[in-house]
Amino acid sequence: MAERDLSKRIVYRVDGMRDVRVRRDVVYKHDAGAELLMNIYAPAGLSGDARVPVVFFVHGGPIAADYMPPTQWGVFVSYGELVAASGLVGVTFNHRLFALTDYERARSDVAAATEYVRSHAAELNVDADRIALWCFSGGGPLMTSMLRDRPGYVRCLLAFYAYLQPAEAQLRSKGAGLPIFIARAGLDQPLINETIDRFVREALAGNAMLDCMNHPAGRHGFDILDDDERSREIIARAVAFAQVHVRRSDR
């Protein structure tokens, strides 16, 4: 089997993606001798007192501990550039989902990443109270954790071709008013799509604020693998969804 090409970028582009400001290899957490790193993508030309909403990109897994860090993958480099060129701050970061037994540790890493950015809001030009989490693939359970905890600074959640845990109770209570965007790949593994379909049914039963887009011919990773209009439409709609909901004032 051919090795995965980790340099592949998303198939959707906007002007200015290469002009954004990037802080690379920022240490957001020390733990057991490990340094966990993030990259922070900001719009070009921000004034010193600017406060911009932020999108965190939560990679999937499990991935081997010695694998290329997700912050270096083309998909997350280009997503960071995309949201920064679209007027938001993008944060990509490495978390430690190395095995299926690591979800609690990965959750603590996600919490540490958000806390680092929020506690350095002035330095990073971010609005600490306007955050979106965008999860991918095996990172989906980290999104359903946010539905359970519902911190007030999280304004919306997005998930692309993600394994999603049952969330009926959360969607009927704390998560009912939290905007959620789901992107489904029609040619994905049946197990993954079964979890997405169940989540969508639960969200609708709970009258959640849900947007769901399906790519009928899309593969797992359609945003880098399938260079077609439907892939570009879904990515563009997801960015627009984040732009709208992180700036909403009715919460």
Task: Put a short name on every predicted segment.
Residues 183, 197-200, 204-251:
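C-terminal catalytic histidine-bearing segment of alpha/beta-hydrolase fold enzymes
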Residues 58-60, 184:
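The conserved beta1-alpha1 loop
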Residues 1-50:
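N-terminal cap/lid segment of alpha/beta-hydrolase-fold proteins
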Residues 52, 58, 160, 215-218:
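Alpha/beta-hydrolase
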